[in-house]
Amino acid sequence: MKGKKSVISRLNKLLVGELVAADQYFVHSRMYQEWGLQKLYERIDHERMDELEHADLLIRRILFLEGTPDISKRPGPNIGKDVPSMLKNDLDYELAVIAELKEVIAHCEGPKRTMTAAASCSTILEETEQDHTLWLEQQLGLIARMGLQNYIQSAAGDIAQGAS
């Protein structure tokens, strides 16, 4: 099915965003693992996998529309130096993705509808808003309420968990 170039271009922009988010989550998850923060490592590694699933969905949609996935204009991730900055950078990126997703959905639901692309983006938007963003906001809220040291202690998990 031949898709509109404007839709394919927007889907490619989203694809780049999902892959950069996956890269950022990948680095952050390994930093958490290195620091012994097992619970954060597991959650952020799960988020990385979600981003790769979103990228897969977008690639499949682009190919279905007879487009070519284009990740040539891929910026680098924004890697934090400590737990709060890492969570904040991840949240900032997710909020930017939400804005982009809403723009693409509005474009696809316009006068010349591309509803399958809109549906794909709506699925990603729902997961991003209700899972990723909410969780990151909760973590930053916990740090503000309980203090960084208490948060880090709770994020470490059991001592035996990190042993391999």
Swiss-Prot record:
Q: Name one GO biological process term.
A: iron ion transport
Q: Which residues bind Fe cation 2?
A: E51, E94, E129, H132
On the tree of life, the source organism's domain of life is Bacteria
**Complex and partners:** Heterooligomer of 24 subunits, arranged as 12 dimers, that are packed together to form an approximately spherical molecule with a central cavity, in which large amounts of iron can be deposited.
Q: Which PANTHER family match?
A: BACTERIOFERRITIN
Q: Name the job this protein performs.
A: Iron-storage protein, whose ferroxidase center binds Fe(2+), oxidizes it using dioxygen to Fe(3+), and participates in the subsequent Fe(3+) oxide mineral core formation within the central cavity of the BFR protein shell.
Name of the protein: Bacterial ferritin
